[in-house]
Amino acid sequence: MLARLRRALLILGCSALAACSEPVNSPYEEHSAAENVLYSAFTTRSPNHLDPALSYSGDETPFTYSIYEPLYGYHYLDRPYRLIPKAAAELVEPVYLDANGRRLPADAPGEQVAISRYDIPIKPGIAFQPHPAFARDEQGQYRYYPMRAPDLRDAFSIGDFLHTDSRELTAQDYVYAFKRLASPRLASPISGVMAEHVRGFKELAQQLAQDDKRSPRPDWLDLRPYTLSGVQALDEHTLRIEVLGKYPQFKYWLAMTFTAPVPWEAERFYSQPRMAQHNLTLDSWPVGTGPFMLTESQTNRRHVLSRNPLYRGEPYPCVGEAGDLEAGLLEDCGKSMPFLDKVVFSLEKESVPLMGKFLQGYYDIPQVERGEYGVAMTVAANDSADKAALYRERGLQLRTAPEAQLFYMGFNWHDPVVGKGDTPEQAERNRKLRQAVSIAFDWEEYVSIFMNDQAQVAHSPLPPGVPGYQPLPQGANPYVYTVKGQTVQRRSLDEARELLREAGYPDGRDARTGKPLILYYDSMGGMGSDATVDWMRRQLGQVGLQLEVRATDYNRFQDKMKRGAAQMFIWGWVADYPDAENFLTLLYGPQSKVDHGGENAANYQSDAYDRLYEQMRFLNDGPDKEAVIREMVKVVQHDAPWMFGYVPNAGGAYQVWVRNAKPSLMIRDSLQYYRIDAQQRVERIQEWNRPVWWPAIPLLLMLAALAWAVRRMARQRRTRAALRKEES
């Protein structure tokens, strides 16, 4: 028994000593906190698609934008967002050609342009990551093509292949990537966009679909022999893309991983029999030229990005927007990226343990691609003095900013009460009704109550960060607000009531019938008893109007929108790319949801607006385009087809030791910019996770007392035995 007590005391003592080095609650291997590794989490499932032709989900972007390298990207710090070259040597302006192939001047009207030709130089010396698809033997033959079934028996990851190699990126790899977007075997979500804009894409897609039906069907559909007339390699480092007509926004598609290069060797490698059964596909193990490569992938458990040893390195930016210098975001100016050796993503199914580990220091960023953590924790700090003190004490960086998205309340242009109107007189009355409702809805109060002040009230269809957006007070909506100096103030309810009277609804009643005017809000979900709808009713009630809610499930709501059966509704839009056209198209007549199946959910139609839109969409970025945008904004502010609603904030939560963190949902390749102070992380984790040993002190004393008593009893027993022996 004495031996057991000694063992228990020894264990407790060793545990206490261990607490001086590595926290006993650490979820990671010993000393991992001291490594140049960033730890983050994912909460639902492993990425579904890492093939650039297929990947279209936000949770996949930390991987795809770190592994693949499009021609263009976005400047990490500048706002409004601006493009920069990535794999391309420079940003290029297109050459415009007419229908006869003759060159047109740069300012040629869009209607005259038949082809926009981009000749894009690619940086020489860019290499693909090491991968077995490139490996060759001593005779120069590919080691892993063709493969025999026994050779694949124990291979379930790229790390299971002994040999890897690489080769230089060429323009042909971009040509191959564009062809893959037309492949019937992939069904890329942007094939329709490419067919609309890239010369020859539609014809290639038709040819591939026909050829893929032939028998026998090969395991690999080799795209190299096929021609895509609008995408060609002029030489090893020059890519030519020909776009139908004039489409200045095409450059933004070149900043998406859809158009990132794909080596034909990788597609052929993964097409071999039994590869898919071993989870060896481009969807699971991508091959790119970016700063990181996927080196570990345990489905729904853990994924690891490691520094690509063949990545050339790119300099950290030296300029940014106002405030970036003070925020320490320019300290690494000119240093070669990436800064991290690895990024580890671990599955956390529940938010409570995820946030618990973040507050303990075991996650550097809760989730890289999600923009709600900084917002939620900022709100929590505002609501709780204890949480505010905790976050402050731990130095957490909670950074939020408006994002390129918008939520608005629309008026259905086909509705007889709030819509366009059948006559000029009715159109003017309906406009004044919409203006009155727009004044009555206090979106500042809405943002304060329901968004916890983590949003910005919108005055136009454009959010901050998009070229053409005008900040206050210049951008204030003059029909809903007054401007005095730098102060912007919502117009009074008396002005709203006067507009109602002019619209034919004095005190909220129809002047002809005396009946109260009832407006209808169409929504998804419950029956309108929640706090949001109650708030809406109170807003309209202030000017004598009544609001009735028509709530339906999602499918029926979508059907009502397609049929134009809704009257008022809330809709949202998240930008695909930071161009005003991306938002202004939501009010373009030919995009009407009812009439054309487009994204104009309000079915708004204005000849003046449509003419300006058709002019704007052909303009290159610059003062001329911004002037047209301002005119378009004036038109919709006057017509009021929307209450412009609000622009929500997005933000990140970062540990104090994470450097260069600037949240953005538009910029997806942020991992290469992050740097960590691993020593500071070790110190803080030890500080925040010190074991609480005092509850063990009484146990130690009891064990010590028991050990002393047992030892005393044993000594007494030996003494008595010795005395008996002497007596005998």
Regions found by a protein language model. Name each.
Residues 22-26, 31, 174, 391-395, ...:
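Extracytoplasmic/peripheral linker and loop segments enriched in polar/acidic and small residues
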Residues 90-194, 240, 354-357, 425-436:
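Aromatic- and charge-enriched surface segment that lines or borders ligand/interaction sites
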Residues 654-691:
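Long beta-strand-rich cores associated with HINT superfamily self-processing modules
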Residues 41-110, 287:
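N-terminal lobe/hinge region of extracytoplasmic solute-binding protein
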Residues 75-78, 196-238, 242-344, 349-353, ...:
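Gly/Pro-rich hinge or "lid" segments in bacterial periplasmic/extracellular proteins
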Residues 295-306, 331-332, 344-418, 444, ...:
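Extracellular/periplasmic solute-recognition and catalytic clefts
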Residues 292-293, 456-503, 523-531:
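Structural transition elements
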Residues 74, 307-309, 349, 401-432, ...:
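A bilobed periplasmic-binding-protein/Venus flytrap-type ligand-binding module shared by bacterial periplasmic
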